[in-house]
Amino acid sequence: MPPTANPLSTPESGDDHTATIVDDCGRPVPAHSVGRRALLAAAGAAAIAPLAFGTPAAASSPGPHAPSGKPGRRPERGHYLIKGAALVSVDPTIGNQAKADIEVCDGRIVQVGPNLKARGARVIDASKMIAMPGFVETHYHMWSTLGRNFVSTGFEYFAAKSATVAAYQPDDFYHSVLLGLVECASAGITTVNNWSHNVRGPEYADAELHAHADGLVRARYSYGHRDGQPATQPIDFADIDRVAATWFGKKPPFGGLVHLGVNLRGPGQLPTFLAEMAEVSKRKLPISVHSGQGPTTAVHAADLEKMGFLGPDFLLCHALPFDEADRQAMVRTNAPVSFSVHSELRLGTAGGFHGQLLRMLAAGVTVSLSFDASSLAPINMFESMNVAWNLGIPWVGTDTAELPPVVFRQAIEMATINGAKALGLQAVTGSITPGKRADIVLIRADDLNIAPIGDLESTVVRSATPANIDTVLIDGRIVKRNREMVSHDAGTIVRNAAAAAHAVRTRAGGVLTPTSPTPPRF
């Protein structure tokens, strides 16, 4: 929904008050190129500049499934000067700075440094904030976001998932994914890998993609199988082709934010996996695979390398049973890994996450962070970084004793640039670098749980929480400002999600049967 007040200050004027025609990013337009039409266009742009929020977010989407409810309004990409922030850039050249400015125009980071001038830009006062790149999450089953509280004592993740997989309708998928996307944006997660492993039919894929069109978050949509699908039955490549043509064809509704991938079940179903890999290779789609939280579910990287499949576009998740041969195969092929830190601790019943994390980093594997599911982890990358940092210490008397510990910078890289590398987006996002898209998070540094700040990286990893996030930009759009979502009506999203979750529980029955015949009201 639109903000109740203009979240920005007056335009940055600079010192020169000479009348000059400039483009939307404040760059002077040569006089010889300024005709009557250009003057009218510039005047029109100036007239609408204060109206930062106006286009409906629910723009036309090509799929046949029409979800119920409108999520909010789509902010325009503006011209902004983020002023005076303490900076954690994750760019090795720019580094961390005690006080820096960031110019953003038309979705792109233009320049970064102290005391910048940006004619015509609207200033965001970040003098009491830390600026950092948006987080990049690499493994999230978003269709089940509604089920975050379906679990209970004695009825945990797999039991709750098994009881509800067939109880979702397409509308439930829409509300689940939209809830997850907007929650991610609010928590500073500007990119996510939607690992869709319960595609029950074309209408379900369409519902998820409608949510992505409305969600305004950068993403990979990783199309997969139906939960419970027979091991001998491949995923629906005919529908993947339909999705590619319908949603990612000539006029995608995502504004360049979403790309298509697949998730596969791995060599555990070897004939099916080989057939699926042959189809994926024809389509040149990036791949995500669960690689095991215990010996019985292991998918070994060394075997995948021998098959000729491993590479930078092959994302392995969990990987707890991996040995040195697997790690070296990943290093040779630049294959990334996604660690869902809470899930590894809860579901990794064979143990070993602490040691695997240290060994992967020591070997030089690209390690990224993820949530797995909302019923396994909080959607909170600050906590994921903190857990990884706390676990990342060598244990005396074990085979990790001589390995280097995880440091704060590594924890931040796992949550940002490494995630971007894992999704093939390192040239687009993951650091505050001129030329990259403006996925930026501003964290209040004067809150009780953060102040007084010292080392910036320690502050981000150990003290900050989503509650401290003041402002979020995704692709140069302000989606959160003054701690409030301005791109979406969060109340409507929550109410729709609550109604959908109530319907899923009612259909599932058993221990999930709601105590009230009507959904809770918020």
Locate the predicted segments by residue.
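Acidic, glycine-enriched loop/beta-strand segments at the rims
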Residues: 69-74, 88-101, 347-353, 420-460
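Histidine-rich, glycine-flanked metal-binding segment
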Residues: 43, 60-81, 86-132, 252
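C-terminal cap of metal-dependent C-N hydrolases
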Residues: 437-494
